[in-house]
Amino acid sequence: MQFFDACEKGKGWGGCKSYCKPDATFSAQAEPLVEVRTLQQYADWMQGLMKMMPDGHYDIKSFATDAERDTVTAYAVFSGTHTGEGGPPPTGKSTRSDYVYSMEFDGDKIRHMTKIWNSGWALKELGW
């Protein structure tokens, strides 16, 4: 949960790396993240996103551990309004977007994370 909180609050890799393997990988079938391949890149991407949406926050809906597969999943809803600089000019529009993180562990560190997210829906709501 500490990694999730640090990542979702835009703490960047500096705030997330203690919970991850140094070479932790990342994947998502979402256009804004197509070139993001490491968890470090993703944590830094989230840091940038939070600069564009300073009111961004999440609401956890489910958090589950599958000990047999060394996997933790988190389902949440991200809400935010595009009022900050960086990326497209601020639109003042908001999104409320469902997503899931599937985090695979090696011991007590995340070795891989997959994000399941309908980015097209969120981008449309934001006017991007």
Predicted regions and their residues:
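C-terminal and inter-domain tail/linker signature
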Residues: M1-W128
